[in-house]
Amino acid sequence: MIDWVDRNTYMERLWALEGTRDIKVITGMRRSGKFELMKAFSASVARKDPSSNNVYIDLLDLDNEPLLEYYVLHHEIIERHKEGARNRLFIDEVQLCEGFEKAINSIHARGGWDIYLTGSYAFLLSSDLVTLFTGCHREVHILPFSFGEYRSYFGEQGAADDEFAGSYDYDDISESYGFLRRGRIGTERRSRGTRSESGAPR
């Protein structure tokens, strides 16, 4: 198993939005990789622009518990701004800060920050984002691993057909897709066990 799978589609989307005025919000279901994506993107921009001021705040970290108050979060962000530098703000699980939109909207109105947030889709629906950020946002919605990403993550290098449910040797390779077409594995003659007319196994 490897540490990280390049999710190029989402990384390219973030790079396309990099430096824009809008608040960038990464949404998705639990365990879909929001945290890892933003962490990878923040590391990427830091390598590309080493002189920039990249502030990363993980609100799941107990060290940041005081920042769960929106006015404390607001003050912290202001204090960490550097004049003359390219300032980027990354906040993970922003919905944990009650009233976070007050802090973020204020920082956005002040200018001087390129803002990226992650949040659970259970708390940050698309309709909510429009209300929270008055339309000044761009949503990047991510999904859990695709089949190909799953195989890459676990270092699977074999044939993709081997990963189908009930995979074993077939007389005809087309039979391996029976599960997808009919909702069962293989064909009747390849079923595991033969049944009598009554339906009982022989």
Predicted regions: what they are:
Residues I2-G19:
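Pre-Walker A adenine-sensing motif
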Residues I26:
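Hydrophobic anchor at the beta1->P-loop junction of P-loop NTPases
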Residues M29:
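P-loop (Walker A) phosphate-binding loop of NTP-binding proteins
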Residues K34:
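Conserved lysine of the Walker
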Residues L37, F41:
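Hydrophobic positions on the alpha1 helix immediately C-terminal to the Walker A/P-loop
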Residues V55-N87:
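Short glycine-rich substrate-engagement loop in P-loop NTPases that contacts/grips substrate
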Residues D114-S120, H141:
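Structural recognition of the conserved hydrophobic beta-strand(s) that form the central parallel beta-sheet
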Residues S127-R202:
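Interdomain motor-coupling "hinge/lid" segment immediately C-terminal to the ATP-binding subdomain
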